[in-house]
């Protein structure tokens, strides 16, 4: 195996490891349990979206490119239906663009690339402004790794980001926020 092929394989393995890190499942679950609001989660892999949905059963549905059109339609309908118990839709990039649902209050980016456009699109899909609404955009990352570098790169132009390390700190930031939108990292 040439050095270039080995390097490429190592980079893919690093991405997979960071995108699907077990601590991100735990953090997402804790956030969803704590805030108990309609939530969309974004990830980079179908595997993560499906595993997170399993972790959050019966309150979550997946939505991704590997699903049949009817299953996607049902996932959206169940998430939108106020009579449904579904409060979380877990997606792997499929809803990054062109998806609008009123009432989503929290978005959790479990994994992302370094692209600021992706970050902007995900924010727009998840947090629609409405008078009196507080929207919460949370980015999960593994500190001191490439994951953190990707986050910093895609958020270079973000002016209202608050960096915290725990759900407790998110609650404190929310109680002190005078803004109607808080972007928590």
Regions found by a protein language model. Give the residues of each.
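Conserved interdomain hinge at the start of the Helicase C-terminal
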Residues: 6-55
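Conserved helicase ATPase core of P-loop NTP-dependent helicases/translocases
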Residues: 38-99, 118-120
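Conserved segment of the helicase C-terminal RecA-like domain
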Residues: 125-156
């Amino acid at each position: 195996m040439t050095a270039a092929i080995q390097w490429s394989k190592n980079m893919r393995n690093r991405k997979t490891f960071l995108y699907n890190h077990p601590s991100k499942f735990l953090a997402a679950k804790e956030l969803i349990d704590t805030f108990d609001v309609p939530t969309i989660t974004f990830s980079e892999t179908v595997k993560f979206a499906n595993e997170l949905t399993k972790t959050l059963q019966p309150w979550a549905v997946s939505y991704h490119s590997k699903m049949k059109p009817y299953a996607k339609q049902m996932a959206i309908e169940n998430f939108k239906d106020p009579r449904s118990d579904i409060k979380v839709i877990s997606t792997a990039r499929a809803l990054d663009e062109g998806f609008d649902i009123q009432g989503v209050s929290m978005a959790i980016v479990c994994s992302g690339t370094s692209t600021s456009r992706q970050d902007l699109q995900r924010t727009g899909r998840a947090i629609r402004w409405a008078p009196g609404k507080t929207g919460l955009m949370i980015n999960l990352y593994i500190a001191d790794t490439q994951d953190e570098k990707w986050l910093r790169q895609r958020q270079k132009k973000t002016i209202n980001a608050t960096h915290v390390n725990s759900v407790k700190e998110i609650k404190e930031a929310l109680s002190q926020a005078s803004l109607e939108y808080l972007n928590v990292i």
